[in-house]
């Protein structure tokens, strides 16, 4: 019996679902090549990697569940800490920005800033107290901070960890998706993904749904296992000209392989790029001690 072990550690879930449901988006797979000509693409040698690349990421944490009292009624909320930052790689890697913010996310109209011994939680309104709505409000605030920090630095290529949605306005931004839960390609075009070699990409395709974006798949080096091992999906704004997004896809394919992580150093190798992994660790460190903040909140509520 022959078998292979996935380098992506099991405690992070599966990088690729065993059965990928079809997307509800409309896909135009003939942006760069017609369907019959689909095959793996190696970036041309005349498409060198950009000398300056900015990597951005954000992290968040719920510090406590909160109930805001209003007479006999109570309204739910969350006290949360979130952070965003950017790493500039221009021959060396440097954290060029990192900010931490906190908030009381709630729909309670009578909510006030919560003052603790070490920190405070200003009120950040949410449309309702539904847990999913509160979580989305937190995610949106983190995304807004990430956009602000990314736009403050001049780099021809900005790698955004996660989907591009909401961050299309950042010049040079490319969404970087490490895991796969939906199938955007079918038939012979999907089979091209399995045929990718290290550093190769698929042709660019266009996805149209509630928002439109260009996309392509790329295989990073150091991947073993199933046909999707080491495969990431990239997204670019649909506002790009076709020729520009093809050049961008080539630049990304030329740039990212050297940043791919190794299994003995990162449990999410090779998809968890070194600059993003390092930035995530730094941002989580800056969130502060969760147990201390929880105690502070309990004291403030007493």
Model-found features: residue ranges?
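Long, contiguous domain-sized segments
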Residues: 1-47, 51-52, 65-68, 92-302
């Amino acid at each position: 019996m022959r078998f292979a072990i996935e380098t992506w550690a099991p405690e992070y879930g599966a990088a690729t679902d065993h059965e990928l449901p079809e997307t509800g988006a409309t896909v135009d797979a003939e942006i760069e090549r017609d369907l019959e000509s689909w095959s793996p693409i190696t970036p041309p040698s005349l498409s060198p990697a950009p000398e300056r690349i900015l990597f951005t990421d954000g992290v968040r944490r719920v510090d406590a569940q909160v109930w805001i009292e209003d007479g006999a009624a109570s309204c739910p909320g969350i006290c949360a800490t979130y952070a965003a930052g950017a790493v500039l790689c221009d021959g060396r890697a440097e954290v060029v920005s990192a900010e931490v913010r906190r908030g009381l996310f709630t729909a309670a109209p009578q909510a006030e800033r919560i003052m603790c011994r070490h920190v405070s939680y200003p009120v950040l309104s949410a449309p309702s107290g539904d847990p999913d709505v509160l979580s989305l409000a937190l995610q949106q605030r983190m995304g807004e901070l990430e956009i602000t920090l990314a736009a403050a630095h001049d780099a021809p290529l900005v790698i955004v960890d996660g989907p591009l949605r909401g961050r299309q306005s950042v010049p040079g931004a490319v969404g970087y998706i490490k895991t796969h839960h939906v199938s955007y390609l079918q038939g012979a075009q999907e089979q091209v993904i399995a045929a990718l070699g290290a550093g190769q990409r698929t042709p660019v395709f266009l996805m149209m749904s509630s928002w439109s974006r260009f996309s392509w798949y790329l295989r990073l080096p150091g991947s073993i296992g199933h046909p999707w091992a080491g495969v990431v999906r990239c997204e670019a704004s649909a506002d790009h000209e076709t020729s520009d997004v093809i050049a961008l896809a080539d630049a990304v394919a030329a740039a990212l392989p050297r940043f791919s992580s190794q299994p003995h150093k990162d449990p999410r190798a090779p998809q968890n790029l070194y600059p993003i992994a390092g930035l995530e660790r730094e941002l989580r460190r800056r969130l502060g001690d969760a147990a201390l903040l929880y105690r502070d909140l309990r004291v403030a509520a007493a």
